Design a protein with these regions (language model features):
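Positively charged n-region of N-terminal signal peptides that target proteins for export
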Residues: 1-4
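Signal peptide processing junction and immediate N-terminal pro/mature segment
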Residues: 18-29
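Non-catalytic tandem-repeat scaffold regions and their flanking low-complexity/translocation tails
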Residues: 28-204
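Bacterial N-terminal signal peptides
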Residues: 7-17
């Protein structure tokens, strides 16, 4: 494809009237050679309304001797008992890991990935491998797009959403949410927005 484009540019440069100057051709050649490729390892969801987390499976790998997370050795992990839980979490018979690092205080026997960076065991809720203080492990739910809640509070990406009503809270998509009194975007109140009528229009 690059050869075809350069060939066409060279032909245009030779036409009467000089539709393209030789300098333009050289610039185009330089652009064609130096234009960067899209980084296939870049996170395509690096924004507040997208899911910033791994696919449900596939980031952990292992051979006969070691476990790896995205090419980096997971120190101390047991190859024989290791399981990928999804969302960056994994565990062996003794330890829970998040993105290859130990999750302190997590119970291996009851730990589960909830999605969106959240996980929990029978006693504690975690966000990105850190304890989410004050959250009820028994009743905590991940609602999507970074939002989670228990019967007493709402959180967004591990931070409490001040004043949000858990009982009426609803995640709407694309970072938007509402309760009976307010509308939120990425965990922040949208001043003046009406929760009763707020909606995300369909795309045409």
């Amino acid at each position: 494809m690059k050869k075809l484009i350069l060939g066409l540019l060279s032909a245009l440069a030779l036409l009467p009237g000089g539709m393209l100057r030789s300098g333009d051709v050289r610039a185009a050649e330089t652009f064609a050679v130096q234009s960067p490729r899209r980084d296939h390892c870049a996170n395509p969801h690096a924004n507040c309304h997208g899911e910033r987390y791994e696919d449900r499976r596939g980031r952990y790998t292992k051979d006969s001797w070691s476990v790896y997370y995205r090419g980096r050795k997971v120190e101390g992990a047991s190859v024989s008992s290791f399981a990928d839980l999804g969302g960056g979490y994994g565990k062996d018979n003794w330890t829970v890991y998040y993105r290859g690092r130990k999750v302190e205080g997590a119970s291996v026997s009851s730990f589960a990935d909830l999605g969106g960076g959240y996980g929990k065991d029978n006693w504690t809720v975690f966000y990105e491998g850190r304890k989410l203080e004050g959250a009820s492990a028994m009743s905590f739910e991940y609602k999507g797009r970074g939002y989670g809640k228990d019967p007493w509070k709402v959180v967004y990406q591990g931070r409490e959403v001040p004043g949000a009503s858990s009982s009426s809270f609803e995640e709407l998509g694309w970072g938007y949410a509402r309760d009976a009194w307010k509308v939120y975007y990425c965990g922040e109140v949208i001043p003046g927005a009406s929760p009763a009528t707020f909606r995300i229009p369909d795309r045409r």
